Curated annotation (Swiss-Prot):
Record keyword Cell division present: no
Organism encoding this protein: Synechococcus sp. (strain RCC307)
InterPro entries according to UniProt: Ribosomal_uS19, Ribosomal_uS19_bac-type, Ribosomal_uS19_CS, Ribosomal_uS19_SF
Protein name as it appears in the record: Small ribosomal subunit protein uS19
Origin superkingdom: Bacteria
Length: 91
């Protein structure tokens, strides 16, 4: 179930302020954030946002196709090492 239209999309206030300030200045440095639940808005297109995955900040370059998705979708938290080979096969 999605979020109510009357409420609007969730974006962390600190992240929103940083993006608006950089858009006004015309700068595009990397923005560091821990807010994985923030929705990507059209004003964020072209910015690189470093999203925390629990261990490190993963740089995410925001494109037009990402608008409406959450920042956490683009910073995976788990690394898949692969399945182990069957140990019984050698008998």
């Amino acid at each position: 179930m999605g979020r109510s239209l009357k409420k609007g999309p969730f974006v962390a206030d600190s992240l929103l302020r940083k993006v608006e300030k950089l858009n006004a200045a015309g700068e595009k440095p990397v923005i560091k954030t821990w807010s994985r639940a923030s929705t990507i808005l059209p004003m964020m297109i072209g910015h690189t946002i470093a999203v925390h995955n629990g261990k490190a900040h993963v740089p995410v370059f925001v494109t037009e196709q990402m608008v409406g998705h959450k920042l956490g979708e683009f910073a995976p938290t788990r690394t898949f090492k692969g399945h182990i080979k069957d140990k019984k096969g050698g008998r």
